[in-house]
Amino acid sequence: MENIQKLIARYPLVEDLVALKETTWFNPGATSLAQGLPYVGLTEQDVNAAHDRLARFAPYLAKAFPQTAAAGGMIESDVVAIPAMQKRLEKEYGQTIDGEMLLKKDSHLAISGSIKARGGIYEVLTHAEKLALEAGLLTTDDDYSVLLSPEFKQFFSQYSIAVGSTGNLGLSIGIMSACIGFKVTVHMSADARAWKKAKLRSHGVTVVEYEDDYGVAVEQGRKAAQSDPNCFFIDDENSRTLFLGYAVAGQRLKAQFAQQGRVVDASHPLFVYLPCGVGGGPGGVAFGLKLAFGDNVHCFFAEPTHSPCMLLGVYTGLHDAISVQDIGIDNLTAADGLAVGRASGFVGRAMERLLDGLYTLDDQTMYDMLGWLAQEEGIRLEPSALAGMAGPQRICAATVYQQRHGFSQTQLGNATHLVWATGGGMVPEDEMEQYLAKGR
């Protein structure tokens, strides 16, 4: 406890985190893209290469997953306006939201129904391509739908994939790996929902369950993979490949906005609110958004009050050297996808200059907003996916932040507030009814 007091003396906001108060922190270390980019260690070329790789796999995905065929084998989600929800939030919280609120429906992405369909599927495909190219079975000019043939399934069955997950990453990696032909093991933490485990098993995936939290599941997965040279471990805490899979979202969103005639520039700022667990998904997406929109996009991460790992790591500068458990927080939250106690050190250090801020919200707040969104817009999400929904209000109420950036009323009135809905499209009906019953 004495150490916590010392930490609080140095970093006063820790007191609110320990008290499980809903907290908003605006990052005083935020820089321009030009200043912050060198610290990421990845470039626009890296993201373009990821984009090209996904294009090579498009014919394969279109055939392997017919639900992607209409989009030409591209796994992408809709952006929709949510005016009724915006009004409801204003009414419930008595705070005007300037500008327009939109929802990015990664919750309804093909294949696995969450943001993890971006990074998880991309890393599995990257590994499959590498193995097939090295074995001389494939060239980058081939039609990748050839990977569906029995010969390739046979080839890939010699290899295995392992991952640790609270649920959604395991789903995307499990389903994709099984489709390619890999043997796959998903190490699931105690928070993982039973239906996610059942869905994986129905795809022939081995699920190993732990009574402990996310960090333990990842560690065990890493250990199990080390003993097998043919086993590839997908490392949610440190993977650059996962990060790049998420980053592709930036250019894609830019294209969607162009199609909708939506302007993002200095007079029309874009605010994006991303739920954050270990940090790979929101970190990668935020990186891609920064490359696409430069200094006109402002990214915020949202975390449960019981799992504020990235806020704690970035705010104190201790990154993965501190966990929420170190300050007496239990890491128990209904937002199972965000139940992470120790943030990715790679993501924290890469993105600490490119984030405008982080905030926390209570489980009950997520349940309330989950119910309102279902009532007002007919869109059903899992609790984690509502974390971003509290963002627009926090920003519109934060005059100090607005002044620091010199935002005028006109700019705020022209703003777009994009809430990134991270999952929920595959939640079973009975489970969803339970979520809805918990809202006020």
UniProtKB/Swiss-Prot annotation:
Belongs to the serine/threonine dehydratase family. DsdA subfamily. Signal peptide: none annotated. Keywords: Lyase, Pyridoxal phosphate. The lineage of its organism: Bacteria, Pseudomonadati, Pseudomonadota, Gammaproteobacteria, Enterobacterales. This is D-serine dehydratase. GO terms for biological process: D-serine catabolic process; isoleucine biosynthetic process. Its EC number is 4.3.1.18. The gene is dsdA. InterPro entries: D_Ser_am_lyase, Ser/Thr_Dehydratase, Ser/Thr_deHydtase_PyrdxlP-BS, TrpB-like_PALP, TrpB-like_PALP_sf. Its cofactor is pyridoxal 5'-phosphate. The keyword Nucleotide-binding does not apply.
